[in-house]
Design a protein with these regions (language model features):
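Alpha-helical residues within the helix-turn-helix
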Residues: 21, 32, 63
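Short, basic-rich loop-to-helix N-cap that marks the start of a DNA-contacting helix
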Residues: 48-63
Length: 77
């Protein structure tokens, strides 16, 4: 993967973590809501993990966080 892609995955994970915390959810609660393990959720949010996601899973995460999907791509820089 190139640097730009890795950086986008890092920012996506940090954005998911930001909105999860803003909603008052734990990683375990969000993971359960989107049918993945807490470890997988932790890997998604970890700034140095670079775990990729399917569009379907991103849609599930946005729905669970009650935010528009596009919000996940408005990276907090």
């Amino acid at each position: 993967m190139n640097y730009e892609r890795l950086n986008d995955l890092r920012l996506l994970g940090l954005t998911i973590a930001y909105y999860r915390r803003a909603k008052g959810m734990t990683q375990a609660e969000l993971a359960e809501a989107v049918h993945i393990s807490r470890t997988h959720m932790s890997n998604i949010e970890a700034p140095n993990s670079h775990t990729s996601l399917s569009l379907n899973k991103l849609m599930d995460i946005a729905k669970a966080l009650e935010i528009p999907l596009k919000t996940l791509f408005d990276f907090k820089r």
